């Protein structure tokens, strides 16, 4: 299938203090989140000057993708659109239409299936095309890539690099802990069932094996919403308490659920969890995310080549866990994943 452009589609984030509350209102629209809760979350962004790292990382990734496209002799413009902040996907798709783009691949900055990881991006695609009108380009979302060999390799290398920052006498006994964003149990059960959890668990197992860790833990982080609504557990903070009670004195935390340093990584892990670990006497090392590594750009262009050349998907682990291929103009990733 021929494509003329790439749209990098992401979550979005504020880029100044005055943008924080409007951004959070966009994220939570229709969910009835109290103003007090939004103001509390806003403090996380304001700690970093009101700037989320995600937009800057995505712009750097686009530069890396453009370099990889050029290296392969592929002439293809790369566009950038977001769900919750500028540049909004609606504006970006309109610009693609005005530039004469007829068909483009879409890479979303989530490796996973499920509603928030995949189907919500399909909604973004459909909304962007609807806003652009009848001349909107055809948009083909690239497949889920949770088991792509380069993703596994990047996280495995990041774990080894994180381990090297621990005191030498603690490295061999450090406990490896994988984290991913928690979601409501009800939402998890609607997509698969347990599709998201199985994909995360599969990726964690592949990364642990590649990094040389036969034992590890899989936990969740960054839950929100009413306490009476069950979310995926255990929480990373609660698990750290369990490890401290067992006498564990060194932990490597790998945010395998994130392909970039979202605020949930740089605040929830690098600040809150780090403070908790220090109080418990645990040496904590956090593995980096792919961010804008050249290897991540290569992964993106690999996915484009799979689409345009009809190549078989590169998957580690024999495809034992469901992964869904490309879809067109906002089709659902899997029939059960309706929201």
From Swiss-Prot:
CDD domains: Ferrochelatase_C (cd00419), Ferrochelatase_N (cd03411). The gene is cpfC. NCBIfam families: hemH (TIGR00109), PRK00035.2-1 (NF000689). It catalyses: Fe-coproporphyrin III + 2 H(+) = coproporphyrin III + Fe(2+). Keywords: Cytoplasm, Heme biosynthesis, Iron, Lyase, Metal-binding, Porphyrin biosynthesis. Transmembrane segments: none annotated. It is found in: Cytoplasm. Belongs to the ferrochelatase family. Fe(2+) binds at residues 181, 264. Fe-coproporphyrin III binds at residues 52, 121. Its EC number is 4.99.1.9. SUPFAM superfamilies: Chelatase. Involved in coproporphyrin-dependent heme b biosynthesis. Catalyzes the insertion of ferrous iron into coproporphyrin III to form Fe-coproporphyrin III. The keyword Cytoplasm applies. Disulfide bonds: none annotated. Pathway: Porphyrin-containing compound metabolism; protoheme biosynthesis. This is Coproporphyrin III ferrochelatase. InterPro entries: Ferrochelatase (IPR001015), Ferrochelatase_AS (IPR019772), Ferrochelatase_C (IPR033644), Ferrochelatase_N (IPR033659). It comes from Mycolicibacterium vanbaalenii (strain DSM 7251 / JCM 13017 / BCRC 16820 / KCTC 9966 / NRRL B-24157 / PYR-1) (Mycobacterium vanbaalenii). GO terms for biological process: heme biosynthetic process. GO terms for molecular function: ferrochelatase activity; metal ion binding. Gene3D superfamilies: 3.40.50.1400. One of its GO terms (cellular component) is cytoplasm.
């Amino acid at each position: 299938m021929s494509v003329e452009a790439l749209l990098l589609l992401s979550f979005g984030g504020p880029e100044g203090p005055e943008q924080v509350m409007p951004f959070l209102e966009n994220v939570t629209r229709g969910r009835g989140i109290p103003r007090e809760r939004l103001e509390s979350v806003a403090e996380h962004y304001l700690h970093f000057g009101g700037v989320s790292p995600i937009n800057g990382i995505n712009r750097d990734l686009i530069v890396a993708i453009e370099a990889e496209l050029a290296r392969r002799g592929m002439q293809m413009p790369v566009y950038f659109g977001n769900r919750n902040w500028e540049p909004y996907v609606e504006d970006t798709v309109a610009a693609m239409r005005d530039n004469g783009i007829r068909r483009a691949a879409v890479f979303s900055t989530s490796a996973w299936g499920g509603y928030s990881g995949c189907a919500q991006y399909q909604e973004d695609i459909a909304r962007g095309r609807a806003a652009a009108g009848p001349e909107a380009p055809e948009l083909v979302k690239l497949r889920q890539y949770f088991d792509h060999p380069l993703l596994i390799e990047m996280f495995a290398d990041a774990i080894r690099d994180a381990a090297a920052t621990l005191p030498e006498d603690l490295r061999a006994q450090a406990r490896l802990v994988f984290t991913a964003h928690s979601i409501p149990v009800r939402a998890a059960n609607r997509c698969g069932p347990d599709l998201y959890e199985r994909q995360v668990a599969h990726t964690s197992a592949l990364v642990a094996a590649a990094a040389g860790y036969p034992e590890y833990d899989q936990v969740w982080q960054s839950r929100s919403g009413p306490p009476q609504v069950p979310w995926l557990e255990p929480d990373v903070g609660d698990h750290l308490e369990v490890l401290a009670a067992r006498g564990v004195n060194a932990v490597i935390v790998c945010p395998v659920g994130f392909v970039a340093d979202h605020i949930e990584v740089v605040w929830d892990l690098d600040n809150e969890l780090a403070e908790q670990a220090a109080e418990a006497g645990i040496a904590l090392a956090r593995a980096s995310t792919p961010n804008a590594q050249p290897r991540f750009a290569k992964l993106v262009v690999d996915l484009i080549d799979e689409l345009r050349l009809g190549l078989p998907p590169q998957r580690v682990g024999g495809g034992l866990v469901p992964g869904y291929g490309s879809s067109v103009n906002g089709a659902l990733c899997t029939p059960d994943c309706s929201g």
